[in-house]
């Protein structure tokens, strides 16, 4: 089904199911003996979503090599890709708070459990923004598990295509305080102009010393429907409602490194291969064109007030 400007989802459909797939990756990486990450909430959250394929993966009845019809080595590289991505953003947030930042905003948080699993400094406030159905599911499921946030967690149930800056501030966000922003696994699901508006609003809400992290798929402009079907079909054959070709926005868009730099940030990018190398993994398995980006805001000259106008 084609995307619309007001489409919505839960964790079993549309963009929402991709959040569940990413959580599956974190659960598998947590089980991996290398111990690159530890997300104890990924597996119970995946099980609570209730999709049979993912439950069987958690039980060890199915693995990625069988599902995607790839070699065990390629399947393992997929797990490592999730692990190093998660570790990169974990380290970014921990470094930001170690530097004194006490306000964190996680955009399109999905089944992200960092507000519960990371060792946050005292008085750190973590804002999570996502679709209302997604936020309600995660909050309720983690409460039923007896999980307690390790930070002051504030859920902001709103679509990022709506006026989320106003909703964020209504939840207590202080734009005068430095913030660590995280936009993980998000940009490919946004129109090019919506991606720009996202970073415009982040910049407008950011005090000097704020930080931002995201990832940018350099080949998204040329991402073909055939490639999308190749990725989606193994899941669809097992009853998962995902059609990547209809979810991803392709075509030319601004490179995030350039766009952030023009807005007064000092961003730096690192390749997936480099993240593999840092973790002692075979870089030949990192055949992905994703760049992981983080940076600090030092210049306010390009800032204008946040707005939802033209968000879609």
From Swiss-Prot:
Record GO biological process: methylation
Domain of life of the native organism: Bacteria
NCBIfam families with a match to the protein in the record: mthyl_TIGR00027 (TIGR00027)
Function: Exhibits S-adenosyl-L-methionine-dependent methyltransferase activity.
Record GO terms (molecular function): methyltransferase activity
Cited InterPro entries: Ppm1/Ppm2/Tcmp, SAM-dependent_MTases_sf, SAM_mthyl_Trfase_ML2640-like
Listed name of the protein: Putative S-adenosyl-L-methionine-dependent methyltransferase Rv1729c
GO cellular component terms, semicolon-separated: plasma membrane
Protein EC: 2.1.1.-
């Amino acid at each position: 089904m084609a995307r619309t400007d007001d489409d919505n989802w839960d964790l079993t459909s549309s963009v929402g199911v991709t959040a569940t797939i990413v959580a599956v990756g974190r659960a598998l990486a947590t089980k991996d003996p290398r111990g690159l990450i530890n997300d104890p909430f990924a597996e119970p959250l995946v099980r609570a979503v209730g999709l049979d394929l993912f439950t069987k993966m958690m039980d060890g009845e199915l693995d990625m090599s069988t599902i995607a019809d790839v070699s065990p080595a390629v399947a393992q590289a997929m797990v490592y890709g999730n692990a190093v991505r998660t570790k990169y953003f974990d380290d970014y947030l921990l470094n930001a708070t170690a530097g004194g930042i006490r306000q964190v905003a996680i955009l399109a948080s999905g089944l992200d459990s960092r507000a519960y699993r990371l060792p946050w400094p005292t008085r750190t406030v973590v804002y999570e923004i996502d679709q209302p159905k997604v936020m309600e599911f995660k909050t309720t499921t983690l409460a039923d598990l007896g999980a307690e946030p390790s930070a002051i967690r504030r859920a902001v149930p709103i679509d990022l295509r709506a006026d989320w800056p106003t909703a964020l501030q209504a939840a207590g966000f202080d734009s005068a305080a430095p913030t660590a922003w995280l936009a993980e696994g998000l940009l490919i699901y946004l129109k090019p102009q919506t991606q720009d508006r996202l970073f415009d609003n982040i910049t407008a809400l950011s005090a000097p010393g704020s930080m931002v992290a995201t990832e940018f798929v350099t080949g998204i402009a040329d991402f073909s429907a055939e490639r999308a079907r190749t990725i989606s079909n193994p899941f669809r054959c097992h009853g998962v409602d995902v059609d990547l070709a209809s979810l991803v926005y392709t075509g030319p868009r601004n490179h995030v490194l350039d766009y952030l730099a023009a807005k007064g940030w000092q961003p730096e990018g690192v390749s997936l291969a480099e993240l593999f190398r840092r973790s002692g993994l075979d870089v030949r398995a990192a055949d992905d064109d994703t760049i992981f980006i983080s940076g600090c805001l030092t210049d306010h000259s390009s800032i204008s007030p946040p707005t939802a106008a033209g968000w879609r």
